[in-house]
Amino acid sequence: MSKPEDLGDANGDADRGDLSGDLRSVLVTSVLNLEPLDEDLYRGRHYWVPTSQRLFGGQIVGQALVAAAKSVSEDVHVHSLHCYFVRAGDPKVPVLYHVERTRTGASFSVRAVKAVQHGKAIFICQASFQQMQPSPLQHQFSMPTVPPPEELLDHEALIDQYLRDPNLHEKYRVGLNRIAAREVPIEIKLVNPPALNQLQTLEPKQMFWVRARGYIGEGDIKMHCCVAAYISDYAFLGTALLPHQSKYKVNFMVSLDHSMWFHAPFRADHWMLYECESPWAGGSRGLVHGRLWRRDGVLAVTCAQEGVIRSKPRVSESKL
C-alpha cells in the first residue's frame, strides 16, 4: 500500500458534516471489536446475521484482519490477505481467533489466523503486511464514469420506491420488507438499480457506492482496511447470479474463499465505488472480481471470491 498521508479524496463526504462526536461507527465499536483473551488470542461476540442465518463472511474476514493487525508494528500495513471458509459459522456462539506470527521481517510480515467454534476451524486466513515504501513503478486502471452518490437513491429510499409500485409482485414485496427491517452497518447506493416487476437477464456486472455508517476518522489506517474487508463481501457473490436470475432460482449460496489486495490508503467511512464483475460460473461455483475506488479515481482495493451456487429451474409464474 502506498504512502499514508492521504486517506482519501480531499473533499471527503460533505453530506455528513462533523461526525467526530458520539456517532462512532458501529463497525468499529461493536461489529469488528475483539476481546483479548491471551497473547494472539481474541474473541468476537457481536455478529450481523444475514437471511441465510449463517455468520456473515465479511465480518469474519474483518475480525480476522483486526486480530492479525494487533500482532504487527504500527509502521506496517496489510497489502494482501487470502482466506478460506471451511465450515459454516454458528451465530449463537462466539468466535475465537488464534494468530500465528509466521514471519516478521524488515519489510514484510506474515500472519496466519484461524477462526474457531466448537473446537473446530471455521475459517483460515493468511495476511501479509508491508512497511510503506516509495515506488517509481506505478500504474492502475481508470475508474468507471458513473453518477456521484449524491445523485443516487440510498438503499432505504430505493426500497421505498419499489414498495410504492402497485404492480410489484407480492413475493418481492415480502422480500423487500424483510430487507428494510434489517439493520446493516453500511450505506449503499446502486448505480443502475434493477427493475423488480419482472425478472431480467443482465450482464454479470454491477456497481454501487458504499461506505461505513458513522464516523471512523483519519488516524487508523489498519481499521479502515478491516472495515473494507467487511464491506467487500456484501452482495459480492450475487454478481454471478445476474445473467441467470430469469431462468434459475438459487437455493444455496455460500462463499468458499476471499482474497484482497490493498493498493492505496482510503477512508472506509467515505463513499467508495465498488465495481463488481463475474468472469465465469460453472461446476456449481461462481467467480467474482471487485475493485474499490476512491472518489478521486484512485484504485484502493482489489478483491476476488469464489463461492458455491446451487440452483434449480424456475417454475413459470403468473405476473400480478
Swiss-Prot record:
Q: Where is this motif: Microbody targeting signal?
A: 318-320
Q: GO biological process: any one?
A: acyl-CoA metabolic process
Q: Which domain of life is it from?
A: Eukaryota
Residues annotated as signal peptide: none
Q: Which CDD domains match?
A: Thioesterase_II_repeat1, Thioesterase_II_repeat2
Reaction(s) catalyzed by this protein?
choloyl-CoA + H2O = cholate + CoA + H(+); chenodeoxycholoyl-CoA + H2O = chenodeoxycholate + CoA + H(+); acetyl-CoA + H2O = acetate + CoA + H(+); butanoyl-CoA + H2O = butanoate + CoA + H(+)
Active site annotation, chain numbering: D233, S255, Q305
Gene Ontology CC: one annotated term = peroxisomal matrix
Secreted among the record's keywords? no
Q: Which Gene3D superfamilies match?
A: Acyl-CoA thioesterase, double hotdog domain
Name the EC number(s): 3.1.2.1, 3.1.2.11, 3.1.2.2, 3.1.2.3
Q: What class of enzyme is it?
A: hydrolase
Recorded GO terms, molecular function? acetoacetyl-CoA hydrolase activity; acetyl-CoA hydrolase activity; carboxylic ester hydrolase activity; choloyl-CoA hydrolase activity; fatty acyl-CoA hydrolase activity; hydroxymethylglutaryl-CoA hydrolase activity; long-chain fatty acyl-CoA hydrolase activity; medium-chain fatty acyl-CoA hydrolase activity
Describe activation and inhibition of this protein. Inhibited by CoASH (IC(50)=10-15 uM). Also inhibited by cysteine-reactive agents.
The record's subcellular location field reads: Peroxisome matrix
Kindly give the Pfam families that the UniProt entry links to this protein: 4HBT_3, 4HBT_3C
Which keywords does this Swiss-Prot/TrEMBL entry list?
Fatty acid metabolism, Hydrolase, Lipid metabolism, Peroxisome, Peroxisome biogenesis, Serine esterase
Q: What family name appears in the similarity comment?
A: Belongs to the C/M/P thioester hydrolase family.
Which proteins does it associate with, and in what oligomeric form? homodimer.
Give the function comment from the record: Catalyzes the hydrolysis of acyl-CoAs into free fatty acids and coenzyme A (CoASH), regulating their respective intracellular levels. Displays no strong substrate specificity with respect to the carboxylic acid moiety of Acyl-CoAs. Hydrolyzes medium length (C2 to C20) straight-chain, saturated and unsaturated acyl-CoAS but is inactive towards substrates with longer aliphatic chains. Moreover, it catalyzes the hydrolysis of CoA esters of bile acids, such as choloyl-CoA and chenodeoxycholoyl-CoA and competes with bile acid CoA:amino acid N-acyltransferase (BAAT).
Q: What is this protein called?
A: Acyl-coenzyme A thioesterase 8
Q: What is the lineage of its organism?
A: Eukaryota, Metazoa, Chordata, Craniata, Vertebrata
